[in-house]
Amino acid sequence: MVLRRDFLTWCNETLQTALFKDYAPNGLQVEGREYIGKIVTSVTASRAAIDFAVEQKADLLLVHHGMFWKNELPTVTGWKKERIAALLRHDINMAGYHLPLDAHPTLGNNAQLADRLGFATEKRFGEQNLLNSGSLKQAKTLGALAAHIETVLQRKPVVIGKPEREIRRVAWCSGGAQGFFQTAIDEGVDLYLTGEISEAQYHLANETGTAFISAGHHATERYGVRALAESAAEVFGLEVCHFDENNPA
C-alpha cells in the first residue's frame, strides 16, 4: 500500500509533468480513498473501464485519457456524471496522464510502441518533442511493415503509399497526431506512423512520396499507461490489472 499523495508525486516526477503545456489536467482527476494497493489501467476512463475497476476492487484507475479537457463545457451531466458518480460511489481514485505519458523516453506511448514494432529511436523532435524518428533494424516494404503492425497491434491499419515502397527511416507519434505529418515529412523519413488519419493526409502522402500509416488511436496508446503502472508497482509493491477494449478508432 502507498499513500495516494506519494504515488502521485512519484508519477508527476517520473513523467516531468511540469514541463508540458497540455490541454488536459495531468494527475488526480477524481479523488477516492487515501491508500492505493491495487491499480487498474485503461487507455480511457470509460464507463466500461470504471465498471471493471469496481469489479476488481481497485483503489485507482490509471488512464491516458481522463474526463476533463480544455475548451469543453465545464459541466458534470449525462455520461460524465454517471462515470464520476460510479467512481465516487466506490471511493476509487482516477488519475490521468496525457502528453507527458506520450513523450516519456522509456515508459511513454511512443517508446513502448517503438519497442513492440522494432523501431530504433534515434531522435525526438517536433512540438514538445512529441515525435520520434529512427531506423528499422532491417528495411521492409511498406506492405510488409503494415502487415507486421497489424499483427502486433491486432488492428488493420490504414495505409497510404505503394506497397512495394522500401521503408528504412520512420517517424511516429501515438494517438491523434496526424496533424504532425508535415513535420515528419520535413525530417525526410520514408514513413510516418500515427493513430488517426484525416482527409488531408491522403493527399500529402501521395504528393510528397512519404508513406502514411494510421494504426489506431487506441491501439497505439495501449502500452504507456501499462508501463507506468508496472514501474510504479515495482517501486511501491502494488497489484496491477490491465483493462482493454475493442475500440476500432
Swiss-Prot record:
The keyword Cytoplasm does not apply. One of its GO terms (cellular component) is cytoplasm. InterPro entries: DUF34/NIF3, DUF34/NIF3_sf. Gene3D superfamilies: NIF3 (NGG1p interacting factor 3)-like (3.40.1390.30). It comes from the Bacteria. Keywords: Metal-binding. A divalent metal cation 1 binds at residues 64, 102, 221. Pfam families: DUF34_NIF3. The keyword Membrane does not apply. Transmembrane segments: none annotated. GO terms for molecular function: metal ion binding. A divalent metal cation 2 binds at residues 65, 217, 221. Belongs to the GTP cyclohydrolase I type 2/NIF3 family. PANTHER family: GTP CYCLOHYDROLASE 1 TYPE 2 HOMOLOG (PTHR13799:SF14), NGG1 INTERACTING FACTOR 3 (PTHR13799). Homohexamer. This is GTP cyclohydrolase 1 type 2 homolog. It comes from Neisseria meningitidis serogroup A / serotype 4A (strain DSM 15465 / Z2491).
